[in-house]
């Protein structure tokens, strides 16, 4: 099992969710996050005053999946979320040993 963490642009969330649904992936956690990489923020003007926005809004999608669907899932996320511009996001893959169902206390197999 793997934990996939995809950090994407907020305006790409619905497209990515739809693409994952077409892969029959239904379980996911979606969080609003802030951060920056190479993009390093931007300048904004509010009521005539310029200020720096250094932490940009992003969406983080987390999925726990069997190993055999990880590569196709990553490919789908990248193809769907990509605009070709700096700030498109990142995908991280981490190993998962096991999980537990909180309601039943049973050890889960994804």
Where are these regions (language model features)?
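Positively charged, small/polar-rich N-terminal and surface patches that mediate targeting and assembly
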Residues: 1-110
């Amino acid at each position: 099992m793997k934990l996939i963490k995809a950090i994407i642009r907020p305006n790409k969330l619905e497209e990515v969710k739809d693409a994952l649904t077409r892969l029959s992936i239904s379980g996911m956690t979606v969080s609003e996050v802030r951060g920056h990489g190479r993009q390093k923020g931007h300048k904004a003007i509010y009521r005539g005053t310029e200020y720096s926005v250094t932490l940009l809004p992003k969406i983080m999608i987390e999925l726990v999946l069997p190993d055999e669907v990880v590569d196709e899932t990553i490919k789908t996320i990248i193809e769907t979320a990509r605009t070709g511009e700096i700030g498109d996001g990142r995908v991280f893959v981490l190993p998962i040993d096991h999980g537990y169902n909180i309601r039943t206390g049973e050890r889960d197999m994804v």
